[in-house]
Each structure stands twice: as structure tokens, then as C-alpha cells.
Swiss-Prot record:
Catalyzes the attachment of alanine to tRNA(Ala) in a two-step reaction: alanine is first activated by ATP to form Ala-AMP and then transferred to the acceptor end of tRNA(Ala). Also edits incorrectly charged Ser-tRNA(Ala) and Gly-tRNA(Ala) via its editing domain. It comes from Clavibacter sepedonicus (Clavibacter michiganensis subsp. sepedonicus). One of its GO terms (molecular function) is alanine-tRNA ligase activity. PROSITE patterns: AA_TRNA_LIGASE_II_ALA. Belongs to the class-II aminoacyl-tRNA synthetase family. Its main location: cytoplasm. Zn(2+) binds at H571, H575, C674, H678. It comes from the Bacteria. This is Alanine--tRNA ligase.
């Protein structure tokens, strides 16, 4: 059976039995605690846990999933993959254990011709929780399985829970026996290579208490409703039904594997390590295509980092098979063609996917070339010293300078039989992050643990009234202090406030949260932040300015009108700039991110080259033309399919429900799906002033603008600057560019003359320094403190000049200088000195130790530095001593 046949058989079977067929959710999960959708049940968690009432009693889906926890196993086992599809059937308080078992057995053992999967009953084994006699008896009664093919196992394998207090229950797993060629007899409890798990039935019926580990917890009682959550791995069933050895050889994955074999000239099946690499390529390319089709872009954090890691592991695998050139142009289309029938968005969006992928590959090929050289040197030096571990500072250098992710360094070290000093690397990373954040001040702090919100979300969604009003009367539904639900908060407390309705906008869609207050009889709360910690619930982080607030108190939410006005100007301005971008650059220049706050907007868009000043001006002029035209802004709520038919733009990476809000500016001039707040006519924006355009990675650009009052203020400042320049330079405004260009040219000419003079001055010092050489053993040492110097480069130039003029006898040159309060010692050796055993790197480190710093370099040229300028004389003495030892 082809993968599509298995998928269709599943959906048809359960659809015919009253299950609502639910399309796959995005790989980007709604759950803020998850980077990705990691299991088929993830989109149904709110229904299974009772936080949100289920809109159906039964459901079925084929859910696309991403898991990278076992990424090191990919390619090495028959069933580990980072992307997989999970067939699931779910019951929300409807049928339970016996019916779930009956459905599973019928679908598995019914012939393919009759709509089933055609498994022989003799090849199937099951496991149950050892205390779940109900499930054991159901299997015997329904399937006729003998006791020896129903194995009872413990909580660690056959009991489902989330890892924290909440829903739990026993589970029953179904296994396929691949036969004695794959392992020992004895069932799943004996050998999980021979016996492959294909389906897991979870009977969610109990409430578990606190505990640790997989099995150390208490069962508190029964759940109000009993639910069913099952999952069948589509790829696992496919490789069994297609008679191949592993999931990488199935019809949806094999085309990429075959293309990798063709590109590398290696034959699949001829060499184990090459086979592993081809399987890695096949898996990771498919995962990358699917992630990018759901809006994920390569980056250095979060989801984007996972995608980048998958793509870079692919490049590495191809290089290890001898392919140094770019290959994504061949591999990605192979995956697209294999997946587009099940997921048309892969094909529809492939132009964008391929551009991103090819740019990422080219960037990493350059990174790999430079970083590999550094790592090869480190490997050689480590082995030469008899070491087993690459230094943490080397790994940090690779990460910080060459963009090498630490996991790649770890892999390459392991390939050379070495490890990495991860503790030192992590320490350096922490120091870097601490420095980066030292001056950052933010009003945001972490929200409470997500579990505290479940009771509030169960009461219903927070209704946002801020589209129509700035003040809303409401009631305090809940208070959270220090991560715990409380009944009151007093002056000075920082708390989260949960309300049934609010006029305060929660940060989302690139728009910053509203500023404002929440007031009531006897209390005044300053709103610091507004967020959506879980879907449908708004939390207001506040400081109690005065009084005491309690649960049940009447309250009024008040939005800062000036703040909201500026935010709406910025958000509507973003839509205009986006539309103008696409008019000028074409439809490929779509938005990839945005940020709006009062008076400021930032728009990231897909583009791989800088915009010329003329293009920037054209975009700004078009956007301001729309402002002057006073276009009406109309918002409508409608089904998403209707919105797409109208041409409303859905932004990549955003997640939308069945019903969406469409924002029109001037009818079709700008039409986007958007839940943000907006002006009622474009003239209210006032002015858009583009103030910057820059790169955000290799495939994105960023355009920044001031909007409204801030834009006018910025123009006033520019006007004042121009007036000052015309006065200072005694030049009319229209002639300023030429006048400034002349001044800059004169400055460059003067700088060149100064540089020539300094070079001559350095040359004149060489004879004096050569005459000061003294013997240290078999080597002549020339050393001197130069006093104050402009930079370390000046010292380096002079050291190099002296070495070149020193002749062929063994010579070491060590010169020091004070570069703005930073002592520098630079050491150079000629070939004869190196033959005599003198190494510049060792000598520079000896000097640096005295200066209170560090140093190093190559045997022919090295540098040391520190913080103690007064110790320069001692540092030069240390060079002599090290040379003499």
C-alpha cells in the first residue's frame, strides 16, 4: 500500500463511523510551551483536558508532526524520523475502551480490498498496563488473541500522562512482528527491533497527582468524562505494508534518498555509513520542506534554529559523501513532488521555500568552509598533545565568529574521536548573553506557570472590546501573584489580572500591548503589559498603585488614548508600506515579520538585496500617497475561505482560525487578515517617514519608519540640521551634497598623506631597532617598548618590517606599545629562529601573562595583551626569559 492509500483508508474508515475529519494543524503549535506539534493529539489537548468544550464527540485526523529529541538516531534505526505523520482517532466522552479496541482490530485486519489495512492477525501482538484487566479481556474477546500475545507491562511504558498533575490513564500498544530474522522470540517486551509498535490506544480516565518520573505518582480518582486518544505512525505502517526495511525507503521519502545517491555517486546499500548519511538527507530535507511550508524560516533561535540545524546537517551529510557543491536545488524538488498530493501548500508555496533554502545553503557552505579549517587545526593540535577534548573557547570562536552551532562542532569532534569542553563553552555563552543584556531594561517579566490559567480559560474566552471603545466595565475574574492564584492584591504588588472582557489590546500580530489602567472602587492598577498566555485568555500584568483589589470587584479598563492612537497609526502604516513594497518589488516581497508601537513601525520582508535610495523613496512616496488620498479603513469578520477568495493576504507563519478579521484600506488597495487595531481612514496616519533599511539574515530585509507625530518631529530635526549645515558651510541647501562630498574627498586625501608619513616614520625606526639586537642563546632578540601608539596595527607593521630587514640569521622581534591604555606585545620570528625552536605564540603568551591578559597566534607571528600598562617592561623581560629557557 502506498502512503496515500493508508491515509485514505484511515480517514474513510473513521469518517464512516461518525468521526469528524479534522485537517492537520500547522507544525507550529498553538501551545506556547511547545516549539512544534509533536504528536497527533496536540491540537486536541484543550478538549481532552476539558479546558475547552469539544465541538464534536468524535474526531479523526492525520497530523503532521516534528520531533528532534532523537535527532542523533535518524538514519541509524528503521523508524526514527524528525518529520512524521500521526493517524489519530479521538473520543471526547463518547465511546471508550472496548469500542476503541474494536475499531483498531477491525481496521488492521480487514483486507485492503474491503477498505482495511490487511494485516494478518497472526503478526500482531499487544501490550496492556499490567493492572488493566478490562483491556486484556477486551482484546481476548474482540480479537481472540491468546494470553501469550497480550503482554502486561508497567507504568513506565503503558501509562499515559503529561508529566504533571492532570489527566492520565492506561494505554494499550499494538505491535507488528517482523519475524525471526529481525530478533528474538518473546514479544514486544523482549525485542523492539523485531516487534514494531504501530498503534497506541490511550484510555484517558483518571486524574493523577503530583510525583516524579514516569511511574512515581498517585492516582487521585476518575475524570468527569472518559476520553480516547490514539495514534498510529503512518510511516511505520507504510514501511511494513510496502515491504521495505525502514521508513526512509517508503514512497514519500525514497525519492530524496535516491537523488542524494545520484548526486554523490554512491550506491545505496553499498556502505553502512553512506546509507546513514543518505537517510539523514532524505529525512531532514522532508522536514525542512514541511516546516518552511508552515512559515518557519531559518534563524538562530527557537523554531528557526531547529530548521537551520536540519538544513545544515543535510549539507554536512552530503559533504561527507564527497559533494561540496550546493544540492538543495535538486533535493528539495524531489521532496516537494513526493509530498504535494497530501499537502498542496508545499507546491503552492515552493518558490518562496526554494529561495529561502538555496540562500541558507549557500551561506552555510561559506560558513562550513571557513569554520572547518579552524576546527581541523584544533583537532590536529588536540591530538598532537594527546588530548581528548577540544577547548571550549575554540567551540565558542566557531560559534561566535563562524556561525557554527555547537551541535555541529560536537558532531564533527565525535567523528574525530574527540569531545568538546561543553562546560567552558556554556560559560562563555552565558557571559556573552549577560553582557548583551546588561543594559536592557524591559517592563516584561515571565508570566505565571501555564497550569494556573486553566481554570480561568475554562470559564470562557476573554472578550476584546477595544475595537469599539477605550473604556470597558468588567469584573475581576482572577488575580495571580508570584505564579499562584490569589483572592486579593495590595498597593505595591505586581500581579496578573484576568477579566471576562477588556478594552486593552494584548500584544500580538506585531502590535505592542496597550498602555493604560484598570480602576475600581478603592483601587488603581497601572497596566504594565497585556499578553495571551494561552489561546483565548488575556492576562493583564499590573502594578497596584493604590488601594486593594479583590476577586469579584467591579472594575473599568482604560486605554491610554494617545498610546492607542500612535499604535493604530503605526499598524495601519505597516499595511500601507507592505502594499507599497509589493507594488514596487513584486509579489515575492511579502511580509515576514513586523513590530508596531506608538509612532514607530518595523516591517521585515522577504528580499535578498539592499534597496537603493531611489527604491526606498518610491516606496515611501506610494505609502504617503495613500495617506493623502484619505482611504477608508473597513474591517470585516468572515470565513477564512471567503477572505482568501477576496484576495486578503494571509501572512506566512501566522496561524488563523476558521473565522478571520479582514482589514481593507481603500478596498483592494490593501487587504490583509489582521486582528490588530487600526485608524478609520488613512489620513489619520498623518505621515510615514522611512528612516532605515537593513539586512535581517541572508533572505530578509527590514524597513523602519516613523509614523504620525514622531514622523513630523523627525522631519523638524532634519530641517534644523540642514539649516545648521548651510550656515556652518556657508552653502545653499541645494548645494550641500556636493559641498560635503568635496570635504570628504579632501579628508581622504589628507588621511592618505598622514598614512604615508607614518609609514615613512616607521621605516626610519627600523635601523635603530636592528642595532639594538642582543643574543639569547642561538637567537638574536630585538625588543623595545614603543610608548604610546595609535593601535596594535602600528606595532604589528613595525615588527614585520624589522623581521624582513633582519637577514637570514635566527631573529626574534618583540615590540610593545600602549594603545589607548591597552598594553600590546607583538612577537615575530623568522624561519631560522623557528628552526631553532622559537615560537611566537608561546612568547606572546608569556608576555600576556605578565600584562594580566591572554595571547596567542602562530609560530611566526603572535600577539599578547592585557590591562596593566605599567607592566610592559616586565612583559618584554618575560619574553627574553621564555626564549632563554
Amino acid at each position: 500500500m502506498q502512503t496515500a492509500d493508508i491515509r485514505n483508508a484511515w480517514l474513510t474508515y473513521f469518517g464512516d463511523r461518525g468521526h469528524t475529519v479534522v485537517p492537520s494543524a500547522s507544525l507550529v503549535s498553538d501551545d506556547p510551551t511547545l516549539l512544534f506539534t509533536v504528536a497527533g493529539m496536540v491540537p486536541f489537548v484543550p478538549y481532552l483536558t476539558g479546558v475547552v468544550p469539544a465541538p464534536f464527540a468524535r474526531a479523526t485526523s492525520v497530523q503532521k508532526c516534528i520531533r528532534t529529541l532523537d535527532i542523533e538516531e535518524v538514519g541509524r534505526t528503521p523508524r526514527h524520523g524528525t518529520f512524521f505523520q500521526m493517524n489519530g482517532n479521538f473520543s471526547f466522552g463518547d465511546y471508550f475502551k472496548e469500542q476503541a479496541i474494536a475499531y483498531a482490530w477491525e481496521l488492521l485486519t480487514t483486507s485492503e480490498a474491503d477498505g482495511g489495512l490487511g494485516f494478518s492477525p497472526d503478526d500482531l501482538w499487544v501490550t496492556v498496563y499490567h493492572e488493566d484487566d478490562e483491556a486484556r479481556q477486551a482484546w481476548k474477546r474482540i480479537a481472540g488473541l491468546p494470553d501469550e500475545r497480550i503482554q502486561g507491562l508497567g507504568r513506565d511504558t503503558n501509562y499515559w500522562h503529561t508529566g504533571q498533575p492532570g489527566p492520565a490513564g492506561p494505554c494499550s500498544e499494538i505491535f507488528f512482528d517482523r519475524g525471526p530474522a529481525y530478533g528474538a522470540d518473546g514479544g514486544p517486551a523482549t525485542d523492539d527491533d523485531r516487534y514494531v509498535e504501530i498503534w497506541n490506544l490511550v484510555f484517558m480516565q483518571y486524574l493523577r497527582g503530583a510525583g516524579t518520573g514516569k511511574s512515581d505518582f498517585e492516582i487521585l480518582g476518575d475524570l468527569p468524562t472518559r476520553n480516547i486518544d490514539t495514534g498510529m505512525g503512518l510511516e511505520r505502517v507504510a514501511f511494513i505494508k510496502q515491504g521495505v526495511e525502514n521508513m526512509y525507503e517508503t514512497d514519500q521519502v525514497r525519492p530524496v534518498l535516491d537523488r542524494a545517491a545520484e548526486l554523490s555517486g554512491r550506491r545505496y546499500g553499498a556502505d553502512h555509513e553512506d546509507d546513514v548519511r543518505m537517510r539523514i538527507v532524505a529525512d531532514h530535507v522532508r522536514s525542512s520542506v514541511m516546516l518552511m511550508s508552515d512559515g518557519v524560516r531559518p534563524s538562530n533561535e527557537g523554531r528557526g534554529y531547529i530548521l537551520r540545524r536540519l538544513m545544515r546537517r543535510t549539507v554536512r551529510a552530503m559533504r561527507l559523501m564527497g559533494v561540496d557543491a550546493a544540492t538543495f536545488g535538486e533535493l528539495f524538488p524531489a521532496s516537494r513532488d513526493a509530498m504535494k498530493a497530501a499537502y498542496p501548500e508545499v507546491s503552492d508555496d515552493f518558490d518562496r521555500i526554494s529561495r529561502l533554502a538555496y540562500a541558507e545553503e549557500e551561506t552555510f557552505l561559506r560558513t562550513l568552509s571557513g569554520g572547518t579549517t579552524i576546527l581541523d587545526v584544533a583537532v590536529g593540535e588536540t591530538k598532537a598533545k594527546g588530548g581528548e577534548r577540544i577547548a571550549g573557547d575554540t567551540a565558542f570562536l566557531l560559534h561566535d565568529t563562524f556561525g557554527f552551532p555547537i551541535d555541529l562542532t560536537l558532531e564533527m569532534a565525535e567523528e574525530n574521536g574527540l569531545t568538546v569542553d561543553r562546560e567552558a563553552f556554556d560559560r562563555l555563552m552565558l557571559e556573552q548573553r549577560t553582557r548583551a543584556k546588561a543594559d536592557a531594561k524591559s517592563k516584561k517579566t515571565a508570566l505565571a506557570d501555564l497550569t494556573v490559567y486553566s481554570e480561568f480559560r475554562a470559564a470562557g474566552e476573554t472578550r476584546f472590546t477595544g475595537y469599539d471603545e477605550l473604556e470597558t466595565g468588567t469584573t475581576i475574574l482572577g488575580l495571580i501573584v508570584g505564579g499562584h492564584s490569589v483572592d486579593h492584591a495590595v498597593a505595591g504588588d505586581i500581579a496578573e489580572v484576568i477579566l471576562p472582557e477588556t478594552s486593552l489590546y494584548a500584544e500580538s500580530g506585531g502590535q505592542e500591548a496597550d498602555a493604560g489602567s484598570i480602576v475600581g472602587q478603592g483601587f488603581d492598577l497601572e497596566v504594565l503589559d497585556v499578553q495571551k498566555p494561552v489561546k483565548g485568555l488575556i492576562s493583564h500584568r499590573v502594578q497596584v498603585r493604590s488601594g486593594e483589589v479583590g476577586v469579584g470587584d467591579a472594575a473599568t479598563t482604560i486605554v491610554d488614548a494617545d498610546w492607542r492612537r500612535g499604535a493604530t497609526q503605526a499598524h495601519s502604516g505597516t499595511h500601507l508600506v507592505h502594499a507599497a513594497l509589493r507594488q514596487v518589488l513584486g509579489q515575492d516581497a511579502h511580509q515576514s515579520g513586523s513590530y508596531n508601537r506608538a509612532g514607530y513601525m518595523r516591517l521585515d520582508f522577504a528580499w535578498n538585496q539592499a534597496l537603493s535610495p531611489a527604491t526606498r523613496s518610491e516606496i515611501e512616496d506610494i505609502a504617503n500617497g495613500a495617506v493623502r488620498d484619505d482611504l477608508q479603513v473597513v474591517t470585516r469578520v468572515m470565513p477564512i475561505d471567503e477572505a482568501k477568495q477576496l484576495g486578503a493576504m494571509a501572512l506566512f507563519g501566522e496561524k488563523y482560525g476558521d473565522t478571520v478579521r479582514v482589514v481593507d484600506i481603500g478596498g483592494p488597495w490593501s487587504r490583509e487578515l489582521c486582528a490588530g487595531t487600526h485608524v478609520s481612514s488613512s489620513a489619520q496616519i498623518g505621515l510615514i517617514n522611512v528612516v532605515g533599511e537593513s539586512s535581517v539574515g541572508s533572505t530578509n530585509r527590514r524597513i523602519e519608519s516613523l509614523v504620525g507625530r514622531e514622523a513630523f518631529q523627525d522631519l523638524a530635526v532634519e530641517r534644523a540640521i540642514v539649516s545648521q549645515l548651510t550656515s556652518s558651510l556657508k552653502t545653499p541647501r541645494e548645494q550641500l551634497p556636493d559641498r560635503i562630498a568635496d570635504l570628504l574627498q579632501n579628508l581622504k586625501t589628507a588621511e592618505r598623506r598622514i598614512a604615508d608619513f607614518e609609514a615613512q616614520a616607521l621605516q626610519q625606526r627600523v635601523p635603530t631597532l636592528l642595532a639594538q639586537g642582543s643574543r639569547v642563546g642561538s637567537v638574536t632578540l630585538i625588543q623595545e617598548s614603543l610608548g604610546s601608539v595609535r593601535s596594535a596595527d602600528e606595532v604589528r607593521q613595525l615588527v614585520t618590517l624589522v623581521r624582513e630587514r633582519a637577514g637570514s640569521d635566527p631573529v626574534v622581534v618583540a615590540l610593545a606599545g600602549d594603545a589607548g591604555g591597552k598594553p600590546t606585545v607583538i612577537v615575530a620570528t623568522n624561519q631560522a629562529a623557528r628552526d631553532a625552536g622559537a615560537k611566537a605564540g608561546q612568547l606572546a603568551r608569556a608576555a600576556a601573562a605578565v600584562l594580566g591578559g591572554g595571547g596567542g597566534g602562530k609560530d611566526d607571528l603572535a600577539q599578547g595583551g592585557g590591562s596593566d600598562v605599567s607592566a610592559i617592561g616586565e612583559a618584554l623581560a618575560a619574553v627574553r626569559q621564555a626564549l632563554d629557557s
